[in-house]
């Protein structure tokens, strides 16, 4: 299966609290997802959870990635995900400042 890319400009302000990225439909036949988040100015670590759904209504957690306040990007590879829809849940926790600027994805 050829690679498929998606770039999402998030511009999520941590000060606004917990958030979700929009739903993303997985390309047909894709089972592996690589996600890289770009961010800046975090004053505490932030948690991002990949969720999956077959009906785009009921989402379940698959994997969690930590956005380390001392870095500016974080990448996770999730293998063997058989689903139609995904979304990302962002939990700011103790963080009050910073921005998540981009979410870059590769599917295969």
Feature names for model-found ranges:
Residues 42-44:
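Short glycine/proline-centered coil/turn motifs in the loop regions
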Residues 51-53:
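Conserved Ser/Thr-centered positions that define the repeating blades of beta-propeller domains
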Residues 30-37, 80-98:
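Noncatalytic modules at the cell exterior or secretory-pathway interfaces
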Residues 21-25, 73-80:
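Exposed aromatic-hydrophobic patches
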Residues 95-108:
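Edge beta-strands of jelly-roll/beta-sandwich modules across compartments, strongly enriched
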Residues 20-23, 56-64:
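Tryptophan-centered short beta-strand motifs
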Residues 8-12, 61-70:
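Solvent-exposed serine/threonine-rich low-complexity stretches and specific carbohydrate-binding patches
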Residues 1-30:
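Transition segment at domain starts
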